[in-house]
Swiss-Prot record:
Protein name as it appears in the record: GTPase Era
NCBIfam families linked: era (TIGR00436)
Similarity comment: Belongs to the TRAFAC class TrmE-Era-EngA-EngB-Septin-like GTPase superfamily. Era GTPase family.
Species annotation: Mycoplasma pneumoniae (strain ATCC 29342 / M129 / Subtype 1)
Domain Era-type G intervals: 2-144
Any single GO BP term: ribosomal small subunit assembly
Coiled coil: none
Subunit field text: Monomer.
Gene responsible for this protein: era
Amino acid sequence: MESIRIGVLGLTNAGKSTLVNQLHKANNLLVSPMNNTTLLAVSTNTITHEKQNITFIDVPGFSEKRHSSYELISQEIRKALSGIDVLLLVVRSDQQQKLPLLQTQLQPLKRYRDLTRVLLINNFFDVVLQAEDKQAIVLDFKPQAVLETDLLHFDATSFWNQFNEVKLQANEFRKDVEFLDADTDNFKILEALREQIIKYCSEEIPHVVRLEIVDKSFDQAKNLLKLHLSISVPKLSQKKIIIGRNAQMVKKIGMQMRQKLLEYYDCNVFVELFVRTYDPKQKKSPYGSLI
């Protein structure tokens, strides 16, 4: 059976992670109104469809150069493009003000001529993408097919019916790229922690924070999963924000993270968090123990 990797790309907050979650009927990928929630390209479980094994790769959204994680995100996008067969571009219909950025980002994609290209228009809140904007994107992107959906009221059957019209082809030049696996325990643990940092801390911190599993063990007699995790940030001021007055913030983050993990695991969970600083000159992965 042929294996196809589909990279889901687009502007930040276009609905890329939401689409992949909907197709898997799961919430493994973190979704947030914050820009660039996804920092690394993430692989998901394989879906068997029409005699093909399809793996969706959730790719970080296009960002502007002034973004603190611009270099990391750009690197991840390039890595993803070299390791996929199909490029699925998601465009949200109400993001007209971001279309100039999108069209700028589409120019470098022209060199990836061997990828099957599909344009998916997310009709957000039933807002229709203006005809001239749609035409401009089609001219730049040159998709083999244009699909439309509303991810807030997603109909998987309708999506697959449209998708069946696309002739998916393996890319003979695809590299054997290794992506983060969204279905592993370690990824779920670190994403649960990152979700709380996004929820409770300023927008600057989630993009520079580096997370690591220092120790993980299971006490079978007590049915207890013990987690010791490290949160690293480049500035002392950011460390103080995460810790909070009388350590109230880091306690809240740990408690809410534990509640999230209880949805995954049929056992008790103990979480201990350490907050430290790292030298910003050192290039550290957002998920130190997974790379």
